Amino acid sequence: MTFEIVRYTADKATEWNAFVAQSKNGTFLFDRRYMDYHSDRFEDYSLMFYLQGRLYGLLPANRKGDELQSHMGLTYGGLVMDAKTTAALTVTLFRELNDYLREHGFHHVLYKCVPWIYHQMAAEEDLYAISQTCDARLAHRDLGITIIQRNAIRWERIRRRALKRAEEAGLTVERSNDYGGFWDVLNNNLEMKYGSKPVHTLQEIELLHTRFPENIVLYTAKKEDAILAGIVVYVSTQVVRAQYSSATPLGKQLGAIDIIYDRIINHDYHSFPYFEFGTSAVDHTAMINESLVFQKEGFGGRGICFDRYEWEL
């Protein structure tokens, strides 16, 4: 075999994290300090690929029965690569990965790729390889609404008016560590509207913030010290992503979300190439929440795809 394939173990965390940090398509979500916060929920089956003793790539993954899944605790996944990746070797890697998986009792693969906005240089060798080697087919496509800052679209009138309302009402925006206060707003909204809870508990998001204080950031909008809205952003090398956003009834009325987005998109992170509002699927289906997409498009966002592929072994 060309590649030595090694299953990740905790003693390799330093090597894993160092590769992620210098990769061309990795983000802090692939850092083991992030991935392992919910290690009890998944049977981790992440893999490391060595070429002549040098680490060539990483695959964040978990096992579910006879299926290898790009790690289901992460928004996106796929092969993490560096600048030395070549198309021919990546085709070989996936051919040998399939052999390895068959030997270890797998029959199916579910593969999430890293969306192109997170690529620091061209990084779609994996997509070419799975089409050539694995007979991969598209299993699911979600829509993420994104602003490309170099070609930013002016906010729609409805959003500009909401921003003006917030300014006239005297709302103040601040970078905050009051995750507890915002989680109360978020929990109440999700419970009332969807009968659900945030993916992260308060304790988990506070833990992750302490581990990644510059990558996980909370902004709140207040009036007289009362939190009317908040947005948690995930900050990677070139993408700022709205991971959570929520407002109280009064906050919605006064445009509290809009004034926070103005601060984040047009001021604090304006120099970042992309701002991503997150995906808008309805309960993990192929349907989109049209009203939510409409709101995001009002800020000048437009669609990119978050894809999952599958193949049989």
Tell me what each language-model feature is.
Residues F3, H107, L171, F272-P273:
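A structural micro-motif
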Residues E67-M72, L292:
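Short, flexible, mixed-charge acidic loops at enzyme active sites
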Residues M72-Y76, H140, I304:
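Short, solvent-exposed loop/turn segments at the edges of secondary structure
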Residues F3-Q52, Y56-E67, P115-G251:
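A conserved beta-strand-loop-helix scaffold within acyl/acetyltransferase catalytic domains
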Residues Y50, L58-A61, V80, T86-N98, ...:
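Aromatic (often tryptophan-rich) hydrophobic motifs at membrane interfaces
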Residues F42-D44, E103-F106, I216, H270-F272:
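Short, high-confidence coil segments that cap the C-terminus of an alpha-helix
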Residues M72-Q120:
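A gly/proline- and charged-residue-enriched helix-loop-helix capping module
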